[in-house]
Each structure stands twice: as C-alpha cells, then as structure tokens.
Amino acid sequence: MPLFAIGERRVQLVGQNHFIAHDATLVGDIILHNDANIWFQVVIRAENDRITIGEGCNIQDGSVLHVDPGYPMTLAMNVSVGHKVMLHGCTIGEGSLIGINSVIMNGARIGKGTLIGANTLIAEGKEIPDGVLVLGSPGKVVRELKPEERAGLLRVATGYVERSKFYKKNLKPLT
C-alpha cells in the first residue's frame, strides 16, 4: 500500500472499506475514514499539518492535497474532489463537489452541499456559503443550488463508494 510515515506523522485508516489506488501516494498525518476512496495518481502530503478525509469522500485521479503549518485540511463526509484538483490547507463542507482542475487555497472554507465548478480558483481565506454554485477565477457565487442539484452531488459521492468496492474486488494487474 502506498502509505508513508514521515517522522512521527503517519497515515491512519479509520473504519473499513478504504480504496487506495496502487499508484496514489499518501505521506504523513492523514486520517482516512470509512469508505474513503483515493484514485490513481493522487498525492496527499501532510508533513506540515493534519489532513482529515471524511467518510465516503472520493479523491479522483491526479489530484493533489497538501498543507502548510497552521493550515490543516478537513474534508467532511461525502465530499467529491474531481480530477486534477489542487487543495491546499482548506476546509470542505459535507456533500460538496470540487470540479475538475479547480484550486482551493490555504484557509478557504467551502460550505455544505456546494458545487465548485471546473477550473475555479478559490483564493486564500475565502468563505463560500452552503448550497451554492461557484464559478470562475477568482471564484464567485453564481446562484443557489436547487434541492435536486444538491442531491445529485451526494449521488456522485455514493456512486464513487460503489465504484471503489467494484475496483477492490475486480481490479487485477495484467502480466
């Protein structure tokens, strides 16, 4: 498994049913909760502070999560982090989705059930409310999400949990 301690900082797997792709790299003070799934070529580095990844979260292919001293990272339950996302010392609320190729900087806080659209930049220290759509660089609130859109964000997370179980059972290297 691609898990590494650095000094006294080590990865902790809480609960069960984790999926960590063979080429992902997790280093340092990381807490990974039940049903969290970490996909191919993800790098999670926590040598400076703690990264907590909540139950049912998915970190999709090519994403990077890193923290600076004094800027821990927390992803609440059922957060979806899209492909090639860069998260740095931020907090993401329950059931939110961070779109492909987005960047969220130190001290930023994303509310619950919020959609950060693809290619969006959330600046350092920015606070985004619950249940909104954010687009652009810098990211701006465009509108509130409809209840069915927020439910769709949760379906993404639960779908990735199911997909991760399929991969755990069926993924085999070719020789």
Cite the ranges covered by each PLM segment:
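C-terminal segments of enzyme domains that contribute to small-molecule binding surfaces
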Residues: 2-13, 73, 77-81, 85-86, ...
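Left-handed beta-helix
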Residues: 16, 21-22, 27-28, 33-34, ...
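A short, polar/charged loop-to-alpha-helix boundary motif
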Residues: 51
